[in-house]
Amino acid sequence: MLSFALTVLLDGISYGMVLFIISVGLTVTMGLMRVINLAHGSFAMIGGYVAGYLTQHGVDFFLALLLATVAAGLLGALCEVTVIRPLYRKGELAQVLLTIGIVFVVTALITEIFGAFPYRVEFPVYLTQPLDIGFRTYPAYRLFLILVGGIIALILWLLIEGSLYGAKLRAAVDNPRMARAVGMNVSLLFTATFIVGTALAGLGGAIGAGILSLEPSYALKYVVLFLVVVIVGGEGSFKGSFVAAMALGIIDTTGKYFVAAAAPYLLYAAVFALLLWRPQGILPPKSLA
Amino acid sequence: MATPNPATGLGAIATGQLSVVGHALPWAIAVAFFFLAGGYLSFGTQVLIWILFALSLDLALGYAGIVTLGQAAFFGFGAYAAGLFAIHVSSDPILGHLIAVAVTALFGLVTGALILHTTGVTFLMLTLAIVSVMFEYANQATKLTGGDDGLQGVNIAPLFGLFEFTMFGQTAYLYALVVLFIWFVIAWRVVSSPFGRSLDGIRQNPRRMRAIGTPVWWRLLAIYTLSAAMAGSAGALSTHATRFVGLSVLSLFTSGIVAVILILGGIRRLYGAFVGATIYLLVQDWSAKVSPYFWEFIVGLMLIATVLFLEGGLMDLGRVMRSVLGRIRKADSK
Amino acid sequence: MRKLLSGICALGVVAMTGSASAETFKIGLIASYTGAFATWGTQFQNAIEAFQSIHGKSVKGPKGEIIDVQLVYRDAGSAGPDKAKQLAEELVLREKVSMLGGFELSPHAMSVADISKQAKVPIVVMNAATASITRGSPYYVRTSLTIPQWGQAIGKWAAENGIKKVYTITSDYAPGHDAEAYFHKSFKAAGGEIVGADRTALRETNFAVYMEKALQAKPDAVYMFQPGGSPSISFVKAFSERGLKQAGIKLLGNGEFAELYLPHFSDDVIGTISVNHYTETNTRPENKIMRDQLIKQFGEKGVTDIASVGAWDAMALIYIALREHGASADGLKYIDAMKGKTLASPRGPIMIDPEERDIIQNIYIRRIEKVGGKLQNVDIATIPMVKDPWKIDNPVKR
């Protein structure tokens, strides 16, 4: 019984890690730039497809991950400079619709290039087998996700709390006007952050392909999940997105185990109730709290 | 708002600039289509249904500034209500339609009351959550909704006992046209009334409106409920016309598409819904023959271009072209 | 001068064929070419084109007239049944087809029942397998299978071959319900015990949870039912990833292990037992003709599966019906022509049930083995001429 409970927990945490890696970029850019970006899932998707293509053609798995991350970051840079920048001053509606437009374009291109069938990332053999963790066997893949997610969370936390860039970022999120007033190059900060966010999304899409399967409808299908993590966690809050991702992963997985049929709508109902109770999210950054 | 700006749809109607001919044209086309359409009649009915759906969103989104991606919740609610009513209570279409509109309006009232105090991204997320809850619930409540298989066995009695709903679609088309006309008149009256004008103010500056004593929340709730009722009506039309309800009426995709349609056509124009729905469905129908996903690409590009360059949607195209040409002429003459 | 001559020649050709003037019979084919079920459309179309390469694109009608058999293909996009219904309406109203065919998904097939009645158009179901479909309208005829034929066969075989406890994981749509119901019924009737049953969402690709629950129940085997393609591939991957194979649990399946999908699986699937009405590598002469033609026309893409054989036999029956009744007969006449007909199909002998208009055929139990370096289904048992059990359990009320 205990081993079963532990399995459910590990499943939930590994799922949450994927959601975190993908969504952390979104929460920072939404909190920082105040832009609603519904196209964020597309970067995860592109990262996944690049990794899939490379691993299917014999490229080393970790190299493929690196290239996928870089590709997503580059595309993020391109997008930010061309179509996202004009959105800073336009209203919510414009942001929502333009980013939906990006999703459509990316979805159509992916279908054209890779076909409509779900696309596989070829993980190395040792990641597709169950691993003996003492009291039972458990998929190595999931342990890998928890490891990678944990490392990334740690690095990001050190970066945001401990580095100059992190301090500038936090300042700009908490009070953008003041940040500009003290001479910070806010637009460079925006661009750099956007790139890091999309690169991370690409990585998340690539390693998470075993849970969030890659298909052309990826960006549309999962955007609600990423938005839930961001908004429930509190826009701009790194800690909030981590907590929300873990909570979402664990609740969703537990729900599937015990109330399988009801799980999806109970989850969204819970999100609804939570947002009514705490509209700013559970751990919003200071200026919004 | 001092003098109404003739450039906006509201202003145009207010200053009587949209002449009688301008108003009559879309309806004349719709009636002519009935006689000329041949095998495309049911396509036309689909266009009419989406026009009504987009019109409902125009009231909430365009005029009142309520940024919602959850309009499909009302469309789907109305569709399933009409379908379930036809199966379990009575197959009379008029009664079913009225009941569907009433329960959807109630649903809109309740959800609006719960969420309209929030704004921005939180509000957006709440609307997304509502649609998602409804979709997932309908998906697993297969005994009630048929789930993925859809609601089977929806039989609609002939309209007024005389006009049958067949696959050839004549009854459905005229029925949809009449319903659309009735709602259009209601929408037009609402937006040109003082209430409608106050919505314009609320959209632009809610704080100021509160400062002058406008009951902002109640006005928003009222328009949200009206918008929900209209969307529910469109859903009921869909059920009656196709004699079928599938899960897609509640999908996030449907919710997104109706917003896309409205923006493409032009928000705050009322007729923008007409332009947007027609163009979108035509593009989809035509490009489906080229390749099944080509239309997504085209629509995506159109959307990006519209947001960046054509804020008033396609209805604004004339004005934008004129200003571009004007600038070119000025540059030439220098 | 040359133009005049060729014009006269053309006139002459028309005049000669004028007495046996060409009529057209249009068939609208609705299947998915994109989305999760994208293979079906292509498989149907390839088989139809291969059939027409051998048997010609036209048939001679009862009065000797030449009937051109034209196919109009439409993509249902793996979308909901409303899409299929809309396409059917378009095909009947705009393209003026006289018959509809295809339908890999049961919801799609079911959605066109009232169109068939209103437009008086026969529907030839080439794959959709929910048992009740053919009862939806007198215009339905099916050349593929019914799920109860499969579920009953493998349930009985499993109980009779040393499997005592089974955990079933089936897809939550009408064919999945049929599979679950009939497996449970025949397995228990033969003495087996069902230790658990789960239903998964139709487009589910993440089966970790279900695998875990199955593992906890300690069955001898897991019986799966998933639509062929990505759901089944993900299912089998999860099956070995989560350690069920290591725990010695067997896997029982159905169409998920068709030859078309085997290249996507690893050697982990060796030993899997599946039930089907068509074993692709069988050595019947009719099968050889079909397979050879498909490879000749489509190369690597010419893999045959149940879609191919469903479409192939459908065309054979349609040609028979056209020969009997010509291009402009009433829809029900074509259905009558197909009732009771027997065919030597590439799958084995088949018959169209004259009362139910449904398929009666052999059902095969196969095991996956490695033959010549490739994964292959090998027949280990045959149950001859099975009538749909659901129809037997649910006779038409007179």
Residue ranges of model-derived segments:
Chain B
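Transmembrane alpha-helices and adjacent helix-loop boundaries
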Residues: 1-334
